[in-house]
Amino acid sequence: MNAILTLLLGIACTCARTPVHAGTSHQTELINRAGNTSLEVDRYARLVELSKLSDVDPQLRIDLNILLPAVDQWANERRNWNPANSSGRKNRFLCGYIQDEWPPPISETSPLYPIWAMYRGRSLIQRPIQSGGIQHNPERRAKYFGEGRRLLGIAREAFPQNKLVRLYLDETFPWPLLNPLDPLAPDWANLQRETLEKLSHIITWWIETRQAPDGQLGGGWGDDVEIWRTWAPVLVGFDDPIAIRGQTNVAEGLFAAEHMKGGYTSYMTDVEHTGEDSGDTCTSMMHLRPDDPVWQARAQRIFELFRDLWTNRNARNQLQFKSTYFTSSEVDTTSQLACDTVYHPRAVQPALLYWQRTADPEMTALFSDWMRTWIAAAAGTERGKPAGIIPSAIHWPSGTVGGLGKNWWDPQNHGESTLYLWPSAMGMMTNTLLLTSHMTGDPSYLEPVRTMAHAREKYLADPTEDPAPGSEAWCASKMRIAETLAKYRLLTGDTTFDPLLLQDANGYVRYRMTGDRKHLIKGLDRSALAFRINRASYMEEVRWTDRQLSFNRNYANHYANPKLPLPTLSALHGAVTGDFGDALYFPMNAVRWKTHARDIGALVTGSGRRNFEAELYHFGNTERNMGAELYLLDKGTYEFTLTDTVGGSSTQTLTVTSPRTQVRFTLSPQRRYTIELRRPS
């Protein structure tokens, strides 16, 4: 590894040659225009123009011939998509070329060197943004960032007008409102619209600018499939045709790939990565096309693999996954890799959603049996684990907590040291336990969630400084189970964990708990803040599609003072859908608005099995015909009341016959509305 880093950081100083003549004034002008523009396609065009000149110095032409293909790769992303590479591994047209020696070196004395440094510097910084192995290793991260910033400093000195270079060197650039504030609209609606409009802008840009004909977005299938998680407030919350088209292209393109013929990937790697291809695509499409038999069958196929291939009974006669590494046809039970983990709900994510919707009895039997294994593991104190704490892994076939690592909290079942280190993806497991309790009616499945919540409350009441790794206090300092507790609160109305939720939950959840809109406004403002600066960090500068919102967290805030706001969309998603958490595990979205996501404010103020309430504000200039598709209401007859704060109320009878009942209505421009559905008294 040291040799690789030496190679990485030494390229710039191993290739000095005799100084190159800068060329004619016209050539110098083209280079300066290429360097100073903040538009990649313009830079490429100026360099192509330079390459067509007949009087270019021979050495400068050599450097240009080296540099121009690299600029082409970065600037003309989708043009480099290759239809022959349907697997996606070779078709990562945004980042597949970023290797240890990219771009190939040119002379430091070349007039093109500052442009070379611009690409080399950004590629070095993008690597830790993407790689957890680098990001979580301070020494390695500092070397990548340090050399990247040094090179970008050279580029900035030569081309001070280039905003992309300056963005990486701690400058911020405003991203103005896409629409002016509406003085008639409530504060929550203006804030929500600001973020929804920009999120819709981002989604549209990605689909229209980067999506290839086969659905890929340039990061490779394994990363492209994750991008819908960012899009969820628009994709799940609204009937937005552009977002739906883009996500459908991703999902159908992925399942058309050869490696998905078995219903799950044929690539052997760990569950965090193998589970994404089918988990993200199938789950998203089950939100968009809940009655489509194709996607239902794909969810059932995953359950079959869970039942017949991936799991068995361990030495303690408990049902568990046999390994962290498996495909659609085989399981690698090498002892080092043989762990069930809190990440494993990802592998069966679509099947869990199918179970939630259908209450399939065989799924109930097997999923609840699997969760019993985790309840038992949480209750024990094996290997020094605190009682009541869910481990991050259970070893196969012994059933002991942890893996082959010397500590229970670090199974060491994967090359990236932090991926399965406790708490790992704990929220996936706690949400699955909550779902199991709901589906079976058995509160014992929530016992690990309760004991962990109490540990968290105890810690917050009297925080321990530097708690010993593996101790209860150490676990409590790291655990993040607020989403599960919030979904439990929405499901049951139980206020037991309200004090903890008021500290850990997002602003929308706090608003629904207390009725205090200051929590809502704070949460929506937090969502909007990050989208007020540095537009390019969400679009043009993203090289790995699973890191679309990671620039501030994974790079900029290592240097920014004050820290830049993080793009946190949980309050936005909650306000639009009524869910107290995300759409991945045990989604409880109450509504999908049957309209596009622009020029609208939609706030769910109440939801449950017997009621639904919301506020709406239409920012447009003409009437808006729209509807609401309602998901949580029990079957029966309801009174639907639409109240216009100017024109009064209208009431009609609505019969709910299925989990997805629609109601249609019309909104007039610049008016506040409330919606209420209740069972007649």
Q: What name fits each language-model region?
A:
Residues N2-T14:
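Bacterial N-terminal signal peptides
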Residues G636-F640, Y673:
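A short tyrosine-centered beta-strand micro-motif
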Residues F619-G636:
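Surface-exposed beta-strand/loop patches in extracellular or lumenal glycoproteins
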